[in-house]
């Protein structure tokens, strides 16, 4: 199991389009993916769960991956977040 804290840096936070990109990326892997904000922990493959976190710009979330391809999943998800979900800012 891998855990990493990461800040949401894109302008609109974890909104619908960003949540969709996150869940699509997470779903490419066999590993379980969990996202935690404060005391709320949701399945990273659930768009509704992610949107319920209401993670705005500047929010620090904790990513957790667990499974055979956990390192690859963590790398892909952190790259997605650090790349502003492909939105440019």
From Swiss-Prot:
Phosphoserine found at: 46
Compartments it resides in: Cytoplasm
Pfam families reported in the protein's UniProt record: PTS-HPr
Activity regulation behaviour: Phosphorylation on Ser-46 inhibits the phosphoryl transfer from enzyme I to HPr.
Entry GO CC: cytoplasm
Domain called HPr: residue spans: 1-88
Domain of life: Bacteria
Keywords per UniProt: Cytoplasm, Phosphoprotein, Phosphotransferase system, Sugar transport, Transport
Catalytic residues, chain numbering: 15 (pros-phosphohistidine intermediate)
GO biological process: phosphoenolpyruvate-dependent sugar phosphotransferase system
Matching SUPFAM superfamilies: HPr-like (SSF55594)
Gene3D superfamilies recorded: HPr-like (3.30.1340.10)
Family note: Belongs to the HPr family.
The protein's role, per its UniProt record: General (non sugar-specific) component of the phosphoenolpyruvate-dependent sugar phosphotransferase system (sugar PTS). This major carbohydrate active-transport system catalyzes the phosphorylation of incoming sugar substrates concomitantly with their translocation across the cell membrane. The phosphoryl group from phosphoenolpyruvate (PEP) is transferred to the phosphoryl carrier protein HPr by enzyme I. Phospho-HPr then transfers it to the PTS EIIA domain.
Protein name as annotated: Phosphocarrier protein HPr
Organism annotation: Neisseria meningitidis serogroup B (strain ATCC BAA-335 / MC58)
Gene it is expressed from: ptsH
């Amino acid at each position: 199991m891998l855990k990493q804290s990461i800040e949401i840096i894109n302008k609109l936070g974890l909104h619908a389009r960003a949540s969709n990109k996150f869940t699509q990326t997470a779903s490419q892997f066999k590993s379980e993916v969990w996202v935690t904000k404060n005391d709320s922990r949701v399945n990273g493959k659930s768009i509704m769960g992610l949107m319920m976190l209401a993670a705005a710009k500047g929010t620090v979330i904790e990513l957790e991956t667990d499974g055979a391809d956990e390192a690859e999943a963590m790398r892909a998800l952190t790259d997605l977040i650090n790349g502003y979900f492909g939105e440019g800012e």
